[in-house]
């Protein structure tokens, strides 16, 4: 009889998880896919709106197996419409397949104040997700960090300043519709301080015009094991630059203006294409310089 009573007590014991503070519930739900976090709204009245207030959302196409007949972009758009948190610290999209509707199905449905936005595409290299940044969307006004990685092709249209708060921009293996798209993207970031640009894919001859008066840290790298002859030309106008990191065996680099605030530089380039570069770096306090000879 005692065992039976004990069993009844166990079944009817209070729901301790539901009694946890919201901050802890947010941390727990942030560890699982958004689709699973949304399913917790069926547990009880207490859980109905918990997921809607999450400060961090991660959409991974590989883990969204319970979204029914909706496509991944449709699911993201609809769930973002339901999200109610006034502040969204981080939004991450991890794509597996090609999608060209991010700018129409997802961007307009972000209603929270967004601080960090990350898009990663892991699909086949021959399939690029084209992203066109639309005109003056409010979601981009508060963005502080933007990270784009993988098989993404950026097409930046003419628009008013749309990243007026962006401080850090990470572009890893990202292609551009044309050279103007890259320039337009930077011109839309009037307070940009950190630029990380990594090339893993062959884009042929490409001019990267970096003219950002507010830029303080610039990193441009090409993966060490990648030795193709596709040539990048970087024209840099960054009078506020303090930290510089460059590694590219075939690239050509030129500095349009002096950089009087530069205190640290790590440069690994081919000497024959960058003979004037050492003179630009003579006043740097901390310098690491590797000049590769012509082959």
Predicted regions and their residues:
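Amphipathic alpha-helical scaffolding segments
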Residues: 71, 261-264, 285
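Oxyanion-binding "anion nests"
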Residues: 283-295
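Leucine-rich repeat
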Residues: 2-209
